[in-house]
């Protein structure tokens, strides 16, 4: 029996603008298992990114619960939420959000610095991760000196520096060409298998999503279909 890492229970989300209410998510239920690679596919505006943000405590649900390792993420203090984001969750975005004035090594180590870890050890861990993502020769380069695919690899390494239980990736290949995007997905699969980290990846590309262990389809705020894939 698989161990459940994250549970989304009857989560709904709506936005209000005067008399107008926009329903984005409707009673979404979801389980993410330890170490699995889960893809959520859907068209733009289907609610998939909103769900990912709620899973990562970046947006509050209008109703429902989100539990990570049994802890209700919306029944804890904002300080505890920040601690969870830094220690237990990793984030990868379509646009890498690397700090432009810092090297690849410093960008990867930054979450560990924020956590208060020893700087020498944090940089040593960052070096190992950069080597693991194939950038051992680019550690001293700033983002402007890296290609789009290389910058996204740095972002993946940064997401893993604090050894999170779960990494949430929002369109991680959306800003890359097909070849670079495919390489990023292969890297995610490889790292998930090596490190035992769970990944939830939001994408509009069903071909890339099909590489993951499991696939859910989001349509009009509902999770509609599940497809199983060979390992």
Curated annotation (Swiss-Prot):
Enzyme class: translocase
UniProt GO BP: lipoprotein localization to outer membrane; protein localization to outer membrane
Enzyme Commission code(s) on record: 7.6.2.-
Subcellular compartments: Cell inner membrane
Keywords of this entry: ATP-binding, Cell inner membrane, Cell membrane, Membrane, Nucleotide-binding, Translocase, Transport
Matching CDD domains: ABC_MJ0796_LolCDE_FtsE (cd03255)
Membrane topology classification: Peripheral membrane protein
Coarse class of the protein's main subcellular location: membrane
Family: Belongs to the ABC transporter superfamily. Lipoprotein translocase (TC 3.A.1.125) family.
NCBIfam families tied to this protein: LolD_lipo_ex
Quaternary structure annotation from Swiss-Prot or TrEMBL: The complex is composed of two ATP-binding proteins (LolD) and two transmembrane proteins (LolC and LolE).
PANTHER family (alphabetical): IMPORT ATP-BINDING PROTEIN (PTHR24220), LIPOPROTEIN-RELEASING SYSTEM ATP-BINDING PROTEIN LOLD (PTHR24220:SF689)
Function: Part of the ABC transporter complex LolCDE involved in the translocation of mature outer membrane-directed lipoproteins, from the inner membrane to the periplasmic chaperone, LolA. Responsible for the formation of the LolA-lipoprotein complex in an ATP-dependent manner.
Stated name of the protein: Lipoprotein-releasing system ATP-binding protein LolD
Organism: Shewanella sp. (strain MR-7)
Designated gene of the protein: lolD
